[in-house]
């Protein structure tokens, strides 16, 4: 018995629900000017564009990290609240990437608990972490990776900056290259995606791509009805042409 395949195509549709926590590095190395106007301000601009491209039904939270990590905005659909928090970010010493992941996971878990108390199923969650440096304080990245895997939350990472970034600390020029390897490892081992950006424009594109990946999903769509309508139209056209040709012969 031969079965006929149903004609279909793939369409991109906004996700009904999802939870995203954006974790951003605000360590002093983000003052480096290898990215114009500097890493910090370029990050702020690109992060706000990421906020704008996410579908409105996605809950978005914001975590900042330097020597410690802080949840500035719990997951919410209030985009203005997140954008305002990005505008008000401040720089500080040290880089606690591991703590940023743990804090982001806590934000996700708290939000999921709230959803469950309403009798609803928690939506899928993801962390999007941007950094330019190496973990220097707090819990190790390996511990954070284990926690993210246990929670089933992928961590997508963005390595931002060049190998030639420097920082002027009281007259001393200090190199601040990007630690790509550790950020790539976090993404690989948690099931997230890894991206690099060495300019403001590249960072904006990375965030735009992530927004598209996270905010939308590809779904098959049955187009058999279109084929049926098209087939009927062709058949009717054939009948009309046949009648016209017959009339010419008579």
Provide a role label for each language-model segment:
Residues 99-102, 114-126, 130-189, 207:
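VWA/integrin I-like adhesion module and closely mimicked acidic/polar interface patches used
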Residues 25:
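Residues that scaffold, gate, or flank divalent-cation-dependent active/transport sites
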Residues 28-37, 68-72, 86-94, 131-135, ...:
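Second-shell loop/turn segments in exported
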Residues 14, 58-91, 102-118, 167-183, ...:
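Short beta-strand-loop
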Residues 19, 192-224:
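Juxtamembrane amphipathic/hinge helix adjacent to a transmembrane helix
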Residues 1-14, 212-250:
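C-terminal signal-anchor/stop-transfer transmembrane helix together with its immediate cytosolic
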Residues 10-20, 30-59, 74-79:
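…and closely analogous acidic/polar surface helices at protein-protein or active-site interfaces
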Residues 28, 48-59, 87-91, 105-113, ...:
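Sec-exported extracytoplasmic/periplasmic mature domains
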């Amino acid at each position: 018995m031969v079965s006929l395949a149903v004609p279909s195509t793939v369409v991109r549709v906004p996700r009904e629900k999802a939870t995203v926590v954006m974790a951003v590095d605000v360590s002093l190395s983000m003052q480096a000017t290898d990215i114009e106007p500097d890493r910090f301000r370029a990050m702020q601009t690109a992060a706000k564009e990421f906020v704008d491209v996410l579908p409105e039904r996605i809950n978005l939270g914001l975590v900042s990290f330097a020597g410690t990590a802080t949840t500035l905005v719990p997951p919410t659909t209030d985009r203005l609240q997140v954008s305002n928090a990005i505008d008000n970010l401040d720089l500080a010493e040290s880089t606690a990437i591991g703590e940023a992941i743990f804090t982001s996971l806590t934000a996700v878990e708290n939000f999921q608990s709230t959803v469950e108390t309403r009798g609803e199923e928690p939506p899928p969650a993801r962390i999007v972490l941007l950094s330019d440096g190496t973990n220097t304080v707090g819990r190790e990245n390996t511990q954070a990776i284990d926690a993210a895997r246990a929670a089933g939350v992928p961590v997508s990472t963005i390595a931002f900056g060049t190998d030639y970034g420097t920082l002027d600390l009281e007259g001393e020029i200090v190199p601040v290259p990007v630690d790509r390897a550790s950020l790539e490892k976090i993404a690989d081992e948690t099931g997230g995606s890894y991206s690099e950006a060495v300019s403001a424009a590249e960072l904006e594109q990375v965030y735009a791509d992530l927004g598209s990946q996270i905010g939308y999903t590809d779904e098959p769509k049955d187009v058999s009805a279109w084929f049926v309508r098209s087939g009927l139209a062709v058949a009717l056209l054939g009948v009309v042409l046949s009648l016209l040709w017959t009339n010419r012969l008579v």
